[in-house]
Amino acid sequence: VPEIKGIAYCVGSIDLKPLRMITEQDFNKCMKLNLYSAVEAIKGYQESLKKNNGSIVLFSTVAAQRGFTNHTIIASAKAAVEGLTVSLAAEFAPNIRVNCIAPSLTKSKIAEPMLKNTTIAEGIAKAHPLKRLGEGKDSASLAKFLITEDSSWVTGQIIAVDGGRSK
């Protein structure tokens, strides 16, 4: 296992369905991608992170705490990631810091199918107090800060990067 000082675990999915259409397989797939694989990655690098006073940054979604129509699958999985964040922050302190970024919809390849419809994209942008969609750099800048020693007094936090949508 290589020596590392930080992990930014940036996986995600957008599987939007009403409850009546959700299957157990939908939940299992989303949990495997967003939670179980994060746990395995962290376990694989835990000793190196501990030795190097490292930092872990996980990713959630504003939907985990705010709630949106048809977001049951992803909101549930990302709420589990938030629980993992605060639990591991307590378990790994003082040697490893663990934080989580909870973005709102961000312009990305994963969101392209939804954002191709300009009416939908504009409507979602208007729902944010800052009246725009997020950019990857919005979350990346925060992740960079959380990985570095500049954030050495920050652990166990779920930080919204959502243009004000969560408030």
Predicted regions and their residues:
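Substrate-binding pocket helix/loop in short-chain dehydrogenase/reductase
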Residues: 18-19, 26-28, 124
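Active-site helix of classical SDR
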Residues: 42, 77
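Alpha-helical segment proximal to the catalytic Tyr-Lys
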Residues: 47, 89-94, 152
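Residue(s) in the substrate-gating loop at a strand-loop-helix junction
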Residues: 61
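Short C-terminal tail/terminal secondary-structure segment
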Residues: 66, 144, 155-167
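Short, flexible catalytic-loop segment of classical short-chain dehydrogenase/reductase
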Residues: 102-113
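A conserved structural motif in NAD(P)-dependent oxidoreductases
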Residues: 128-139
